[in-house]
Amino acid sequence: GCFMKAVILAAGKGRRIGSEKEGTPKAMRIVNGRPMIEYVVKELSFVEEIILVVGYKKEQIYEHLGDKYSYAVQEEQLGTGHAVKCASEFFADYDGPVLITFGDMPLLTTKTYKKVFKAYNDSIKKNNPAACVMLSVNLKDESLPYGRVIRDRKRSFVEIVEEPDCNEEQKKIKEV
């Protein structure tokens, strides 16, 4: 595999898509006959180690995926940054790239993930290492319920603000 680690954020309840009512973690929602998380781990099978950050109803994810992956627990859902921090023990003695993705993104492919990794490697080759390479999209419809990418005047990444927390100005941003 590729000398790289991947963190899959899969602790969420999925309130907006009704998973919580079903008693299922968001990443275990069925898409085309399989849980979303299954597609994500399959597409990331090229990496050295996959760490899943689990929380709500975590046993369902453990039971489905088994012990071929590493697990970190996010007891309280305190946001994306906190979820990544919950996996930090797996990087204590690691100095390589870490790909962070979401357990509810079943349509991202190996090809896309490898392009992100290549962009990071290219930045190193140019002697200008990127602290972060981010995959985002610009949506035509800003009314969709996604976190918005906030950038500064130089277009550098600042933060992601989840849709329910966005002010009116942030809701106009089309980059998610």
Q: What is the role of each PLM region?
A:
Residues 28, 71, 132-134:
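Conserved beta-strand scaffold positions in the cores of enzyme catalytic domains, especially
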Residues 14-18, 143:
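Short N-terminal binding/cap micro-motifs at the start of the first secondary-structure element
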Residues 11, 55, 103, 137-138:
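Histidine-centered beta-alpha loop that forms part of the nucleotide-sugar donor binding/catalytic region
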Residues 1-5, 16, 30, 34-118, ...:
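Conserved N-terminal catalytic core of the sugar/cofactor nucleotidyltransferase
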Residues 108-176:
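Conserved core of the sugar-phosphate nucleotidyltransferase
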Residues 22-27:
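Short alpha-helical oligomerization interface
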Residues 21, 65, 161:
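Short, flexible helix/strand-to-coil boundary loops that buttress conserved ligand/catalytic motifs
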